[in-house]
Amino acid sequence: KLFLSKSSIASTSEGSNGIFSTDKATVYANDVKITTKKGGNSRGLDATYSGVIYANKMNISTEGDHSASVATDRGGGYISVTNSTFKTSGSGSPLIYSTGDIEVDAVKGTATGSQIAGIEGQNRILIYNSSLTSTNDAISGSDPIKNGVIIYQSTSGDAETASSKLGDFEAVDSTLKTTISGGAMFYVTNTNAKVVLQNTKLDFDSSKVDLINASGNNSNSWGSQGSNGGKVTFTGIKEILKGNITVDTISNVNLYLTKNSKWTGSATIENNSAGTTSKSPLTVNVDKSSKWVVTKSTTVSNLNVEKGGKVVDSKGKTVTIKVNGKTKVKGSSEVVVTATGKYSDTIKTSSKSSLSTRVL
């Protein structure tokens, strides 16, 4: 074990992490300033092969490429950070990058050369009471599209250890902001994912940027074309969501609006001719207290709306819902939602729609 307090760490070379824990070692850090300059692959906190880091009152700044403020890498690891400040400026240097398990609480951070956060493989990021911003308006690293948060699986082997069965991103009582002018706030490709947001503000230009993009890719050998789609269960709890959803036919988005949540947007199911069409690319679930404000006529695979839940247009008028060519709900709006599969008045939730137990 290592205990470090009221200290300053600086590095100027390639591959020089500020604090590094590996092989089941544990580090406790409090009131430490970490600065990594010039050299790439120089993270502030890095844990691999079941290494553990507990950190509080950290001030972390990195300048190089592939230098996240906080990262878990090959072999997985666990990092918790509280009451801290993050800053990154390099390409491919998100504030948080997880191939393990990372929790942050009461953290403020700004990334100027990368997205907010990234999860590779079946790993996890949990965010509480934090404000994280990306001011980068370029594609981060070698990503296929611009994004605020990416959940994916590469072929690097870095994400060989899983801390959960899904790539799991959760944010509670927080603010996530990106200034990208295209792409998606959440981008999922070549993996299965879970996103849960509770009382968290998403700040992005929803007129230009999708809320969610789940699709296959032809970049970086991230899976085989036609079978490398993204699958995500995306849940809002007491959430105000804006922005459209794009999902291709080899992918799957299962959206849940719960506990007084509201989503304003529409959806597009794009054809991916390289693979077999998913049975249900897009399912929208609206509980009895929530609302979907449909901004234009939209086709979904399945639509489940509990009694009391609302599906309306921007003027508050009930939209028409058609299921397999038959009118299920006759609305007063010109907007039409078409379900090619099933329509019901019940929704079924699972652990994929629930917040994880906090470790912090």
Locations of regions flagged by a protein language model:
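Long, low-complexity, polar and repeat-rich extracellular regions
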Residues: 1-360
